[in-house]
Regions:
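Active-site metal-binding motif and surrounding structural segment of the metallo-beta-lactamase
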Residues: 135-136, 145-196, 295-312, 324-329
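Binuclear metal-ion centers of metallo-dependent hydrolases, dominated by the metallo-beta-lactamase
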Residues: 90-92, 97, 193-195, 199-262, ...
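Active-site-proximal beta-strand/loop segments in catalytic clefts of secreted hydrolases
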Residues: 119-120, 140-143, 167-171, 197-199, ...
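Classical Sec-dependent N-terminal signal peptides that target proteins to the secretory pathway
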Residues: 3-19
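Active-site environment of divalent metal-dependent phosphoester hydrolases
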Residues: 123-124, 145-147, 170-176, 201-204, ...
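Long, low-complexity repeat tracts used as extracellular stalks/passenger repeats
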Residues: 34-35, 42-61
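Core dinuclear metal-dependent hydrolase active-site scaffold
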Residues: 58, 65, 71-160, 230-299, ...
Length: 378
């Protein structure tokens, strides 16, 4: 009776947040719970009410604060619960076993805003929109051609002008939407600056010939822009200022012959209002080792990390250990998140589950994933 009353109380006070949590918890496979991939508790905060959701018992109970029935989206955020990392390989610092569950993280970026745009097709992709304190837009990659309509809609809703567009590497799931925008000026999107660093076209032909044409198509699309818009000569250590946001180029492309284009990803570090976000593109294990060899740990440490290669078969554990992020951005659709090739969780050959276990070892509290829709940090 007591449990039923508490459940009813919280469902009235937090209808949207509670229902979202309830549905997501019900959807978690028991295998994930047993393997320690699911947080022991989900904590939501709404106008002073703290609600703990137990993943096993599905019991919701008020833990502190004063309840209010008035909706206030501005006060909704993920809060910390506190727990010690259990694996000796991790940094051993306090962490909160919380997944944001698609709830916006509010009051984190001090007036700036980061949106991880959701995939509009069933493929992996990366599209991140950063807004400065003054409202100017910075784009990282942009996703596939199939993601273009949602991206255009998002940009037009904010005025349609992108001050700075950063490209990590020329793969279609990262630059397909940008190419579509460049080919269709009638969309109404304007771009002030595009930053990138590519190898010679012959290098792509030699190492990933089946993707070489895409690079040529992208370079051809660039020719529709004024020359002063294109910055294809960026270098390690270069700093780009957009209002209050400082962008640092962390590497020249590493030209490995194995996993060639992924390993050639340019890494960008964005600093805004005391927080750091690092974008790894599709960087692989070899380039990841080179990245940490070329940069001291204090320069790489960040608050937010975009998971390399959509969270699987990217950089190694040691890179994430040095980064020590608090928030992970996952460009993974549901099938990739669950390593599901069609026969259930864990049936595929991808390494997402392994990477998720790494993050649990490191005590990373917050995980935002494109499978859950547009994800917001502000």
């Amino acid at each position: 009776m007591k449990k039923a009353c508490m459940l009813a109380l919280c469902s009235m006070l937090l209808p949207h947040a509670y229902e979202t949590a309830r549905q997501r918890l019900i959807g978690w496979p028991q295998q994930e719970v047993e393997e320690g991939l699911i947080p022991e508790g989900l904590i939501l905060k709404k106008q002073g009410l703290e609600t703990a959701v137990d993943a096993d018992a599905m019991m919701v109970g008020e833990t502190s604060g004063t309840a209010s029935t008035q909706p206030d989206n501005s006060s909704t955020r993920v809060i910390r619960t506190g727990r010690q990392a259990s694996n000796a390989e991790g940094p051993g610092r306090e962490y909160e076993p919380v997944m944001s569950m698609g709830i916006p993280i509010i009051g984190y970026l001090g007036g700036s805003k980061l949106t991880l745009l959701a995939n509009q097709t069933n493929t992996q992709m990366l599209s991140v929109l950063v807004e400065t304190n003054q409202g100017h837009m910075i784009m990282i990659d942009g996703g596939t051609e199939g993601d273009s309509a949602h991206l255009v809609e998002s940009l037009l809703a904010r005025g349609g002008h992108v001050d700075t567009w950063l490209i990590t590497h020329p793969h279609s799931d990262h630059v397909g939407a940008l190419m579509d925008i460049l080919k269709h000026p009638e969309y109404g999107i304007t771009i002030g600056n595009i930053y990138y660093s590519f190898a010679y076209p012959s290098w792509y032909q030699e190492n990933e010939a089946y993707r070489a044409d895409l690079v040529l198509d992208l370079l051809a699309a660039f020719q529709t822009l004024p020359a002063q818009t294109l910055h294809g000569d960026i270098f390690k250590g270069q700093e780009i200022m957009v209002d209050n946001v400082k962008i640092t180029v962390m590497n020249q492309p590493y030209l490995y012959t194995h996993n060639a284009i992924n390993n050639s990803s340019v890494v960008y570090l964005l600093e805004m209002n005391g927080k750091k976000a690092i974008f790894l593109g599709d960087m692989g294990e070899e380039a990841g080792k080179q990245l940490i060899a070329d940069n001291p740990p204090e320069k790489l440490k960040c608050d937010i990390v975009q998971m390399a290669h959509h969270g699987q078969d990217g950089v190694g554990f040691e890179v994430y250990r040095i980064l020590q992020p608090e928030i992970c951005l996952w460009g993974a659709p549901s099938w990739l998140w669950n390593n599901d090739s069609g026969s259930g969780m864990g049936s595929g050959n991808w390494k997402t589950i392994e990477t998720r276990k790494w993050m649990a070892q490191l005590g990373v509290p917050y995980h935002l994933c494109i499978k859950d829709g547009d994800q917001i940090i502000q």
